[in-house]
């Protein structure tokens, strides 16, 4: 804005704070492979990860100036904590038949991410530093996925291969957050503000199957045609809404691949997929 003498008001905001942070990060991996015999193999792996962090912002002072004159100030602080871990595990089995290129495999995978995050804000009296009010938010959550897959392939003669298999995926997502308020150093009470307390429970189950056929021609061409079918069912609800209506759906995904083997072991490919 302009003053009566035509000059413009000058506003200035100044912030300063002391900050601290600490954290822990780590990953651990374990793998195992075992050949039962020349026809049967096992493989397993486990991966564990952890990520923790803790930060503070002390004496967050905000000063507002108008034309170099202090017009107001606030004093605040906050604390943030997060603890997260994840586990990924897999187990695979493969059986090789006496006939070349004929094999059966089973795969399973498990993945889970778990976390807790919390932040707390303090509003302090800028004169004596006493606590005026506090706000706390706490959130527990996890994501989980379990997968099972079976595959089988077998040759027909020396120029054809048939493949088929099935797969199921089970996903779960959960989040539960709650907010609390307190006056001064008094006890926390649940926040009555809309949208500050809720949870989400979400489950998704997918069943899929596929069939593919490969034909190798004498002129160096190879043709692979197939199709995949998926059916998905979803259920979800929250603290404020029961049985959210999410329709189940199915899709069919055809595919076609044509390749030509060239000299010097080079290959040219063309493919088509419809999503």
Regions from the language model: what does each represent?
Residues 1-275:
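Primarily recognizes Gram-negative and organellar outer-membrane beta-barrels
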């Amino acid at each position: 804005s302009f003053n009566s003498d035509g000059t413009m008001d000058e506003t200035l905001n100044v912030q300063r704070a002391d900050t601290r942070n600490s954290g822990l990060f780590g990953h651990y991996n374990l793998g195992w492979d075992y050949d039962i015999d020349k026809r049967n193999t096992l493989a397993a792996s486990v991966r564990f990860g952890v990520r923790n962090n803790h930060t503070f912002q002390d004496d967050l002072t905000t000063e507002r100036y108008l034309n170099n004159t202090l017009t107001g100030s606030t004093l605040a602080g906050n604390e943030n904590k997060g603890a997260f871990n994840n586990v990924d595990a897999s187990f695979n089995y493969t059986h090789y038949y006496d006939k070349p290129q004929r094999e059966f495999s089973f795969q399973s995978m498990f993945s889970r991410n778990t976390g807790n995050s919390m932040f707390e804000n303090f509003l302090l009296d800028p004169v004596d530093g006493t606590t005026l009010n506090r706000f706390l938010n706490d959130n527990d959550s996890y994501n989980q996925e379990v997968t099972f897959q079976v595959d089988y392939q077998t040759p027909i003669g020396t120029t054809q291969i048939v493949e088929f298999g099935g797969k199921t995926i089970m996903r779960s997502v959960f989040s539960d957050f709650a907010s609390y308020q307190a006056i001064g150093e008094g006890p926390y009470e649940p926040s009555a503000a809309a949208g500050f307390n809720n949870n989400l429970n979400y489950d998704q189950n997918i069943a899929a199957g596929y069939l593919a056929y490969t034909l190798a021609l004498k002129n160096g061409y190879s043709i692979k045609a197939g199709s995949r079918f998926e059916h998905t069912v979803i259920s979800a609800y929250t603290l404020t809404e029961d049985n959210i209506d999410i329709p189940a759906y199915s899709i069919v995904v055809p595919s076609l691949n044509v390749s030509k083997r060239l000299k010097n072991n080079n290959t040219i490919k063309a493919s088509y997929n419809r999503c």
